[in-house]
């Protein structure tokens, strides 16, 4: 993920402090929204059992780790110039969340974009228990754990000489980069990040177009409302990734095609730090797709007071 540089000459003097303040404010507000959304998805039986919410629950958990753990350490390091709670164990877990959990969230979003086609237009594929296991649960588990387990091995188990730096973001680079074959670095850049982001674009846009095209074919009102909710939810959530991750992918692809200096003056101070934004925005995108949102917000901010009859004390003589 990105960083908050303050020494680059092409950055206005006010920008690092402004960016820092915006991220702190966004983090505080986002955490509150995470709790609100998680409560209404996890503790409402109908929402918790809905297949399309399973991937959303894991996405919320992964991105919550990014907002509370990864972003907090990044902001603290940027504020004081070093990692306050520096220790090798902390550094390893920081690297795991920043890479394994982050890539895991992107893989999950890619699967969610594809699975939503099945849930909206081919719901007969997930009617039996066997179909649920093969089509829903196995892919969900795979895309949830693939990147976190891969980076757990690379960070905690891969044999290399660790040299943590308390003044650097993520305590310095991960040591496996120095010895791992170059093909893996190419694989990691494309398979774990670039291709999933591009597939999110394809699957999300095609879902929206299919929904608009087949809108008239959906005869039952119940089916129509359910399909609309699932499409809106996926569109809102995927948009948070596309707006803030797609620019980074486009710049990476152009640089990989023989233009290494393309946008190099903006990618580090501006574009790289945008990769933190989806984790901040995700709960709001999920919130907008919650059923009966207006009623939930009204209960939160304007709950009714129960009328109580007050009987005055009367003294009898």
Question: Each predicted region: which residue ranges?
Answer:
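Intracellular effector-coupling site of seven-transmembrane GPCRs
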Residues: 54-61, 209-248
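Extracellular TM2-ECL1-early TM3 structural module of rhodopsin-like
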Residues: 12-24, 52, 58-111
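Extracellular N-terminal segment of 7TM GPCRs
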Residues: 1-36
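Class A GPCR helix-loop hinge within the 7TM core
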Residues: 102-138, 290
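Helix-to-loop junction signature of class
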Residues: 2, 23, 65-82, 102-105, ...
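Loop architecture of class A 7-transmembrane GPCRs
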Residues: 1-11, 81-100, 128, 133, ...
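Seventh transmembrane helix
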Residues: 237-238, 242-253, 269-313, 317
